[in-house]
Amino acid sequence: MTRPVVAIIGRPNVGKSTLVNRLCRSREAIVHDQPGVTRDRTYQDGYWGDREFKVVDTGGLVFDDDSEFLPEIREQAALALEEASVALVIVDGQQGLTAADESIAEFLRSHRCPTLLAVNKCESPEQGLAMAGEFWSLGLGEPHPISAIHGAGTGELLDQVLTFLPPKDQEGDEEEPIQMAIIGRPNVGKSSLLNAICGEQRAIVSPIRGTTRDTIDTSIIRENRPWRLVDTAGIRRRRSVNYGPEFFGINRSFKAIERSDVCVLVIDALDGVTEQDQRLAGRIEEDGRACVVVVNKWDALEKDSHTMTAMEKELRSKLYFLDWAPMLFTSALTGQRVESIFALAALAVEQHRRRVSTSVVNEVLKEALSWRSPPTTRGGRQGKLYYGTQVASRPPSFTLFVNDPKMFGETYRRYVERQIREGLGFDGSPLRLFWRGKQQRDAERDLARQQSRKG
């Protein structure tokens, strides 16, 4: 179903992300004592009673400073208010009312979104009542004392949130979205790509490395199906990142790869494939995720009729972990081929989830054996591949039964995988091949049993 949105609004370091984690029972939002950790608007699933909703966390609002990302953070907050059913405005009860809180109240009055005022860091009921009183002057309604860390008052606050949500019968059914993670090194254009796809300023774009720190979820409809796009923090070598918000953002990025159906690995056309790109490619293959390689900033290169072919060959020679992944040359700046990402990603997901019957698998293996026999030992012992069967999908995984797995070296194993790909496809998806030793008569009996069951 289409879920209503609850926006979290407030100045820096009042505990917005802590409250998001409390409301959503997760630790997805990055919490750190450094102000300005959250920059883009990030979405999580919230639940209370029999209702489901989206909680959108926004960056800390500052109105007396236009340095760095602060104007963009204000724009992100305004976009969140446009789609929200209610805005939860968070203030710091221990610090008391500030001029920044008053500026935020003025900002909210220019939007039509209903508001609920939460006074955070009220660690006891007596404290809460005393602290909340001065916030009536903001004109945002009754102040609700809460403790985001300990959970005090959050149940009552959520009861109030539900009164602003549309009735359940106004929420329609929705298909489970495809999870697509947009990953890459810092500053390769991931956020620009996300904005080009969505047609709006969904993520803050800046030449400063590390602009995106959270993983940013965006829901969108493409190819007649729902997608959830995750723009991740730029992933660098861990020893180059200090312990802090960016460190946690990188960990979130690795988790985004793990929970994705398909990864879009963004490569900078100007830089080519770096050592870190290779590490990311290896991570995607290791986690068994479908993948599309997107070469961004294609508009910035001088080209002739052979440039794309030559560059793809060069890039693939270095991205050997992902030789099965389709490659697309795009420009987030001009929008060139951006929409084609979805068609390739949808095909990769389809192949990633695909299953093939045992009989079809063995037709391919039989042909592979006819072209190239298994290796023979110096003593004259012949390797034998009895049969194969698909045992799993996501990624497609096959068990191959042989007389002795040790006789099948890496070269022949790669040959068999290539033949499976040529015969069965699986473009955009990694494969897993498991080689198992078995006596010939047992293998023949098992294969006959499988075929009789399917017949």
Curated annotation (Swiss-Prot):
Keyword line: GTP-binding, Nucleotide-binding, Repeat, Ribosome biogenesis
Keyword Nucleotide-binding carried by entry: yes
KH-like domain: residues covered: 354-439
Pfam families membership: KH_dom-like, MMR_HSR1
EngA-type G domain: residues covered: 4-169, 178-353
SUPFAM superfamilies: P-loop containing nucleoside triphosphate hydrolases
Biological role: GTPase that plays an essential role in the late steps of ribosome biogenesis.
Quaternary assembly: Associates with the 50S ribosomal subunit.
Sites where the protein binds GTP 2: 184-191, 231-235, 296-299
InterPro entries: AAA+_ATPase, G_ENGA, GTP-bd, GTPase_Der, KH_dom-like, KH_dom-like_a/b, P-loop_NTPase, Small_GTP-bd
Family according to the record: Belongs to the TRAFAC class TrmE-Era-EngA-EngB-Septin-like GTPase superfamily. EngA (Der) GTPase family.
GO MF annotation: an example: ATP hydrolysis activity
Gene: der
Alphabetical list of PANTHER family matching this protein: GTPASE DER (PTHR43834:SF6)
A GO biological-process term: ribosome biogenesis
Amino-acid positions noted as binding GTP 1 in the UniProt annotation, renumbered to this chain: 10-17, 57-61, 120-123
CDD domains linked: EngA1 (cd01894), EngA2 (cd01895)
TM spans (from-to): none
Organism this protein belongs to: Synechococcus sp. (strain CC9605)
Name used for this protein in its record: GTPase Der
